[in-house]
Each structure stands twice: as structure tokens, then as C-alpha cells.
Amino acid sequence: MIVDYEKDPRAKEAIAIWEKGVLKEKDGSMSDAINFYRSALKIHDNVESLYRKKILDEWMLHKKLSGLSMTTDAPDEQNETGKDDLSVEENAELQPCWILEILPDDILLRIIKKVILMSGESWVNLSMTCSTFSKLCFHDSVPFKTFAKYIYSKQIYDKMAMDLNGITDINTFEKEIWRGDDYRMLRERPYIKFEGVYISVVNYVRYGSNAESSLSLLKPVHMITYYRYFRFYENGQCLRLLSTDEPSAVVKHFSKENKPRHSHMCYWSLGFDYDFGHLKITRSDEKYTFIEEFQIKNQGNKRYQRLKWLSSIVVDKEGNASNCSLRNEKSFFFSRVKSFKDPG
């Protein structure tokens, strides 16, 4: 049922209170604004929609009046140039804020492109605000093209893997495989995420032994918990840490500028095996080279959120390789960290 807010006293009262909340929000007084919004909702539960309709009606009226004024001749030069501040204020009050009616789709798509470059999460959040943005965000090719160009330009591919597959240029390769279908490429081509940390939580049980003087038949049981952390950088570096410290104590300051004790700086690259989801992480010291390999996989509906172990190899200076046991190891899961957003 459509309510005529001009004839319904409750609707008019609720809109008036809602407008006070809008003014408070513009001034930065969010607590006062929320109080006004709550009061308005108690009077009329559909007040936000009525307020938006009122704004739209005012804008449409303004457009009609502007069209009429353009078709009438100016009485004289004095009236043309003698508009006082009141007219300016009236025009300012009628400025549009109903962007979905006022702005064409190409402008809205430019806004969406800017949002995508902020973060993929912001893109999803914007799409959920209304049906118009949902349609433009996920039923138009521009957003997918923007995100694909943004994220895949940051991926680093192993030079040897490219040579073995006869690939000289990754951009040419992706055009041959996906033929400009960015939506399909995003669904089929895994990528590394940079604005967060990949964390693996490992729990296992270790059985202890009784003291020599103990008469107990039961052996003590120890629950061992440790964490592995990866943070990837766009220049091919990767910060690695094995620690018993929980994420709440590690993640906030986990960076190559402030390296935690016992952390290592590694190098990462992608290969083309495992449906383009082959990840290799390497590091070296004076005696050994360590190679850890993973497959990038989905976590439920979240794409490319998980790193599944494939192998962990240690190679000495003579070239002798040893495989490390993965019996207790668990997959890594990506956790977004807002402060890791590249300011550039």
C-alpha cells in the first residue's frame, strides 16, 4: 500500500523527525541522528522510503520548473541579473540527492569502478544496497573487467612454469583462454589476496610419560596448538611466521617493516597446474632451500580463500631433497585486515 505522505499526519511527522536525523548525520552527530531515526521509525515503520520518495518528488518538480523557466523569455536584463540570495538558497535546497534517478548508468558505473579499486568487499557491499546497484555491479561487464584487471595485474607467475607451457606473455595467454570473458576468468582463475593474512591453525595431541615414581596407569595428554601465518606482497615477497601466539597478538603488527621474531621473508609465485591454482613459496638460508607448495581453493562460497598443502621440501646445498611430513598440517584460510589496504 502506497502512503500519501502529504495527507497522512503520521507520515508527515515521521518524515520531519527523519530529516532532523539527516541534518545531524551531516554534522557528524551520529548518536543524535540515530535517536531521531529511531523516533521516526516508531511513528512510521516505512519512513525511510517515504523520505526518499519526498526527495525524489521535490527533484522532479524542480526539473519541471526548470524546463518551464527555460521556455519563458526574460522580462528584462535587470531581472535576469538581479536574482537575490534567496533564489540561490532555494536552488541549493532543491539540489538532487536521489542519485539513481539523476545520474545515468555510465556515471554510476564509474562510481562502481572506484569502489572496486577500494576493495572487492566494498564492491559486494555496494551491490546489496539496492536492486539498481545489484544489477549494475553483477549484470554488467564493466565491474568484472575492472576487478579482473586490478587483481590479475598483481599476480606473479613462475618464469620456469611459463617457459614449460610455452607462454611468453600472460596477457596474451589469458585472452586465448578466456577470450575477454572476465566473469568466467574470475570464476576459473585463482589469485592471491593481499589485503589480509592467511592463517593455519594446527591442533594435535601428544602423549606424555609418567614420572618413574608414578603409580598411575594413565599417561598425560598434551594438546599442542600452533599457528602459521602468510602475508603476501605484490612485489613477490611473502612474510612467513610459525608461532604459538594467537592471531589477536600477531596480525595487527604483522608486516615486513615490523618483522616478528623468528619470521622469514620468502618469495612466492604461481604456476599453471591445479587449474591455475599452483602456489609455490620459497626461502633459503646458508644451508638449505625450503620449498612449500599449495593449491588455491575455495572455502564454501568464498572464492580462492583457502591454501591446501601439497608438499613441503627441504633441499641442501648438494641438491639432496627431503620431504617433510604434512600429517599434522592444516589448510590456510584468508582473513581480511582493513589496515593492510595499500594507501597508494
UniProtKB/Swiss-Prot annotation:
GO terms for cellular component: cytoplasm; SCF ubiquitin ligase complex. Residues 98-148 form the F-box domain. TPR repeats lie at residues 14-47. The keyword Acyltransferase does not apply. Keywords: TPR repeat, Ubl conjugation pathway. One of its GO terms (biological process) is cellular response to methylmercury. Pathway: Protein modification; protein ubiquitination. It comes from the Eukaryota. The keyword Flavoprotein does not apply. InterPro entries: F-box-like_dom_sf, Hrt3/FBXO9_C. GO terms for molecular function: protein-macromolecule adaptor activity. Substrate recognition component of a SCF (SKP1-CUL1-F-box protein) E3 ubiquitin-protein ligase complex which mediates the ubiquitination and subsequent proteasomal degradation of target proteins. Probably recognizes and binds to phosphorylated target proteins. Interacts with SKP1. Component of the probable SCF(HRT3) complex containing CDC53, SKP1, RBX1 and HRT3. This is F-box protein HRT3. The gene is HRT3.
